């Protein structure tokens, strides 16, 4: 009998292969599933898998099977009469397959996703009369990283040092970190294994030469990862500790004796903030009429002893710095003319020019009129000259003498008394 069974096995295998071949004229029966499914480490994930059967097509599904590439045996099977069976019953579950129902949905849920679960899986439908249909799905296991950024507080060193730190912890795959800044600088990025197996922690340092100019400025850490819908931006406010930088303001180079008051301000920029201001002169203490009020020096009134070099010394936790200002007091207040504004001077000059132009026009018309009157009188004068003669009765009589004749004859004058 055993020999009979052994002889029957080849015939049985041929029969099974024949049953698995689709008969001629049957429509396309296909399995639908995404090529890749992402899942997060420690969470559950569903591998979708559906059988699409054309209308009016008679298809009988006898079994659903899931297998992983590179491993022998099946990880999950659902038989039409025997129900489900799993290689890990606590981690695997068919989502929709039920006894007594049509087996069209082979979707499989996996719980407690592990790094080693990443790989290629095959979903297979055993159908009749079409035969077996399958599709491959790649399961991508991700770990969403936690991101932080913090400032590295530094002092003036004159050398490049880390001034900001950005960390992306426990990512799978490793996160990508970049920096954005207008201050220059360069990144230094490193990776170490994360707390969970298969994860990576990425640390990036922003390196720059510290100075007072970058204190309080911002740099941005940009973190990109497959699990993010958009990059995460983390802003870091830089901190540089430095001693005071001091200057004195308020002197306009126009102080004079007897001026009611004047004020100077000691401008200091430092980190940490200044803790003290001290005013003095190069000759020693301040004169009595100069009163220090913190960052300000009130001078009331302005007198000759203030005609010196003033010193403001500022202190903070890192040291002390000072600034000097030389004051020269004038004998008297500015003249009134010095107070005339530029606009007033411009209007005054324009007024004088207009007056001179009008005066010139008036003189021109006056002389023009006089010249015309002189010419008119000359036109009325006769061409002959009159000569006076005395009459017999003692009266003087005049006779006209031609100018032409007067040139050849001497004038004759008669007179009787």
Curated annotation (Swiss-Prot):
Residues 24-139 form the Ig-like V-type domain. It comes from Homo sapiens. Disulfide bonds join 49-123, 166-221, 266-312. The chain crosses the membrane at residues 344-367. Residues 368-372 are annotated as: DYNLT1 binding. SMART domains: IG, IGv. Can form trans-heterodimers with NECTIN3. The extracellular domain interacts with VTN, CD226 and CD96. The cytoplasmic domain interacts with DYNLT1. Binds with high affinity to TIGIT. (Microbial infection) Interacts with poliovirus capsid proteins. One of its GO terms (molecular function) is receptor ligand activity. Residues 368-417 are cytoplasmic. Contains 1 copy of a cytoplasmic motif that is referred to as the immunoreceptor tyrosine-based inhibitor motif (ITIM). The phosphorylated ITIM motif can bind the SH2 domain of several SH2-containing phosphatases. Mediates NK cell adhesion and triggers NK cell effector functions. Binds two different NK cell receptors: CD96 and CD226. These interactions accumulates at the cell-cell contact site, leading to the formation of a mature immunological synapse between NK cell and target cell. This may trigger adhesion and secretion of lytic granules and IFN-gamma and activate cytotoxicity of activated NK cells. May also promote NK cell-target cell modular exchange, and PVR transfer to the NK cell. (Microbial infection) Acts as a receptor for poliovirus. May play a role in axonal transport of poliovirus, by targeting virion-PVR-containing endocytic vesicles to the microtubular network through interaction with DYNLT1. This interaction would drive the virus-containing vesicle to the axonal retrograde transport. It holds the Pfam family C2-set_2. Glycans are attached at residues 105, 120, 188, 218, 237, 278, 307, 313. This is Poliovirus receptor. The modification Phosphotyrosine is found at residue 398. PROSITE patterns: IG_LIKE. A motif (ITIM motif) lies at residues 396-401.
